[in-house]
Amino acid sequence: MRHYEIVFMVHPDQSEQVPGMIERYTGAITGAEGKIHRLEDWGRRQLAYPINKLHKAHYVLLNVEAPQEVIDELETNFRFNDAVIRSMVMRTKHAVTEASPMVKAKDERRERRDDFANETADDADAGDSEE
């Protein structure tokens, strides 16, 4: 079996359907003895340029190991699903399991925000004790 990286973008009005879509697609992959190496739901993001007069889309990234028949089936599902506005399937040389730069940046922002909140709380506590 070969390794693939799959990214698909869902219409922003259909964001609530994304978990069901992910479950359906991962079920098709694992049902054919495939493996999911990485699954990231990037959420709703701004598009670089409008697609069908849309400026935002819900992004999902999958790194999988699956037979070609399953990949063909997924591409057909993407093509005929009106909620999927764009998709891309790329073959990779090996399984990618580390977090993507998108998730790493999000985690770093979250850590900085938490550190700032802790520092602010510590400063407020120190200010209360001086009075």
UniProtKB/Swiss-Prot annotation:
GO terms for MF: small ribosomal subunit rRNA binding; structural constituent of ribosome
A cellular component annotation (GO) from this entry: cytosolic small ribosomal subunit
Keywords in alphabetical order: Ribonucleoprotein, Ribosomal protein, RNA-binding, rRNA-binding
Listed SUPFAM superfamilies: Ribosomal protein S6 (SSF54995)
UniProt function note: Binds together with bS18 to 16S ribosomal RNA.
Family membership noted in the UniProt record: Belongs to the bacterial ribosomal protein bS6 family.
Record-given protein name: Small ribosomal subunit protein bS6
Gene: rpsF
